């Protein structure tokens, strides 16, 4: 009997081990996707409009007047508790100063002029009008021009890149490369149209972005992205490795099951997972989970009931400002909760109010927050997360990025991680906060991408 029981236990152990190994290391087949799926109103027309139309940003007088009237007529806010700064969320006394600035000092017309300093366009992709900026560099002899698609996250738009675009499109004496930049508003964000159909998740947005680049004549291209843009970009690199030549992300993350196991192994043996210098960005896990629990309330609302929170934010510019500004502040420096500004003073106030204004005038807060619900409710997203991307990838981790993963975890998703940078400054909105550091890393990473492809060609020819 003992031998039978021992054999049974051994069999269960072996079987369990095989199942666990399969779950951790199995690479599923890519999902079958309709690469021309229609996201516009109604059904696909016989002939689709493929024109590329110049576009100009306009904060018109009627919209500005309505906004200012709403701000003037706002109800008094409840004051913060005694001794509380930003620990409970947006400090309403500080918010009052921001709203007064927005009402009386923010120059709507001048800000629109600044936003229009780049060439803006719209084109219809799979039924939705997508807005994008396209900036061509000065071409000098001996300098290679690399097409670069840039994608933002929530609650941003292509405006987030207005400080980094001039750096990327200007040749640098230490490099023989420069970028032609296409900075796009994700569907439902900024000046891009949102869909009226469910299912427009990061995988499907990746398909749309690939089709946008094809529309613009780029068969192959590079990508830079953060936040939701990074998720979409990672899926593009996974699904279209022959078209994406390199991926640079300021929010590199692996969601493969093995990565989760490694995270928990690190709780017992942290030195196996992460360099001692950066250990406090992950461990102890109780601190990480406490931070996640504290700061992701908005995430849970938007991933479950985006339309409900959208009702409040659509009708009140003061409410919209408080909601967006609090998240932009904490994601710029989460160590400043004990200040009235909560981290906001790491960013230029006009830049922050540009984002709030763009969300307000386009009434896009609902369509943008719906991405949180779509991003976690479709099997195809989970499938693509589990497939390694073979595209050469570079990651940069700023100090106050929302989540940090060391290279040993990142390589689960990105086996060809050709460059990894960890900085002791900066935050989630890197292009606004630290544009020079971001641009420098993009240039350096592009060199590594080119070397990767050179090695690959040499291996094929030998």
UniProtKB/Swiss-Prot annotation:
It is a single-pass membrane protein. Its EC number is 3.3.2.9. It catalyses: cis-stilbene oxide + H2O = (1R,2R)-hydrobenzoin; 1-(4-methoxyphenyl)-N-methyl-N-[(3-methyloxetan-3-yl)methyl]methanamine + H2O = 2-{[(4-methoxybenzyl)(methyl)amino]methyl}-2-methylpropane-1,3-diol. The keyword Nucleus does not apply. GO terms for cellular component: endoplasmic reticulum membrane. The keyword Membrane applies. One of its GO terms (molecular function) is cis-stilbene-oxide hydrolase activity. The active site is at 227 (nucleophile), 372 (proton donor), 428 (proton acceptor). Pfam families: EHN. GO terms for biological process: catabolic process; epoxide metabolic process. It comes from the Eukaryota. It is found in: Microsome membrane; Endoplasmic reticulum membrane. InterPro entries: AB_hydrolase_fold (IPR029058), Epox_hydrolase-like (IPR000639), Epoxide_hydro_N (IPR010497), Epoxide_hydrolase (IPR016292). Keywords: Aromatic hydrocarbons catabolism, Endoplasmic reticulum, Hydrolase, Membrane, Microsome, Transmembrane, Transmembrane helix. The chain crosses the membrane at residues 4-24. Belongs to the peptidase S33 family. Catalyzes juvenile hormone hydrolysis. This is Juvenile hormone epoxide hydrolase. It comes from Manduca sexta (Tobacco hawkmoth).
